[in-house]
Amino acid sequence: MQHVKIYLSTAPVVATIWFGLLAGLLIEINRFFPDALLFPFP
């Protein structure tokens, strides 16, 4: 179990999980608020 924790805490694994979550969040925001870059909020 110790080796699994060490593996999951390495930079490539953490970066992959982080960028995957960030991409999913941006996709969901873009789904509910499309064209947010073209029409700025008042």
Curated annotation (Swiss-Prot):
It comes from Adiantum capillus-veneris. Its main location: plastid. It is a single-pass membrane protein. The keyword Transmembrane helix applies. The chain crosses the membrane at residues 7-27. It holds the Pfam family PSI_PsaJ. GO terms for cellular component: chloroplast thylakoid membrane; photosystem I. Keywords: Chloroplast, Membrane, Photosynthesis, Photosystem I, Plastid, Thylakoid, Transmembrane, Transmembrane helix. It is found in: Plastid, Chloroplast thylakoid membrane. InterPro entries: PSI_PsaJ, PSI_PsaJ_sf. One of its GO terms (biological process) is photosynthesis. This is Photosystem I reaction center subunit IX. Belongs to the PsaJ family. May help in the organization of the PsaE and PsaF subunits.
